[in-house]
From Swiss-Prot:
It holds the Pfam family RrnaAD. It is found in: Cytoplasm. PROSITE patterns: RRNA_A_DIMETH, SAM_RNA_A_N6_MT. The lineage of its organism: Bacteria, Pseudomonadati, Pseudomonadota, Gammaproteobacteria, Vibrionales. This is Ribosomal RNA small subunit methyltransferase A. Keywords: Cytoplasm, Methyltransferase, RNA-binding, rRNA processing, S-adenosyl-L-methionine, Transferase. InterPro entries: KsgA/Erm, rRNA_Ade_diMease-like_C, rRNA_Ade_Mease_Trfase_CS, rRNA_Ade_methylase_Trfase_N, rRNA_adenine_dimethylase, SAM-dependent_MTases_sf. It catalyses: adenosine(1518)/adenosine(1519) in 16S rRNA + 4 S-adenosyl-L-methionine = N(6)-dimethyladenosine(1518)/N(6)-dimethyladenosine(1519) in 16S rRNA + 4 S-adenosyl-L-homocysteine + 4 H(+). It comes from Vibrio atlanticus (strain LGP32) (Vibrio splendidus (strain Mel32)). S-adenosyl-L-methionine binds at residues 18, 20, 45, 66, 91, 112. Its main location: cytoplasm.
Amino acid sequence: MRNDVHLGHKARKRFGQNFLNDPYIIDGIVSSINPLPGQNLVEIGPGLGAITEPVGKLVDKFTVIELDRDLAERLRNHPDLAEKLTIYEGDAMKFDFEQLVKPNNKLRIFGNLPYNISTPLMFHLFEFHKDVQDMHFMLQKEVVNRLAAGPGTKAYGRLTVMAQYYCKVTPVLEVPPTAFVPPPKVDSAVVRLQPYEVLPYPAKDLKWLDRVCREGFNQRRKTVRNCYKSLIDKEVLEELGVNPGMRPENLTLEQFVDMANWLHDSHNADK
């Protein structure tokens, strides 16, 4: 039997398709999402319905976004789900999630994300953080490790800082390749991202936060003083409580934001 065909559908590499088919894992994911009737639920990439079907048994209606035309058509004709689903056929990377927001009913987003686009897709979703209650995603385990990492670890990087800027990050469940058809070449994991009601360390301008993160993690083995010498003087770093001799990979989220806010203020003062 071919290992890239599941329920009569051939997995498409260009869409990064791997279909979940382990009942124990599926049950664990649905339990962690804990979908309830009346909630504003949105699934990205429902695929063949491994998560969609059990969620559909618990709620009256929800929204799905599916890029694969054949899979979207299957859902439109699904005997149990068709009446419950609002189906958007298209690319979640270009989707305006604001259109799904309802008064006093924030979005609860979940999905088995295609690993080839998971990082840029999360950056896209962070733009809507004020409208999102939580997100549960199946991702490459390495990406979940990066999301949850702490300063000074190998996994700590720009994705870590930006994810933790917006969200509380909680790893939920590890998933082996055997839980999928076809099995991916990597281990997977489920993560919960809960956007903060109030950002703990708000940046005055995200462009500066992105800049200090990029500069720092592109030169993570340099000292902070050398890494940022064209942007911030050693004396200013010390005033901000940043040790100029440390490496950027040891900076905390708060320190990255402090540097970004100082750059914002100093550049605006020059105008």
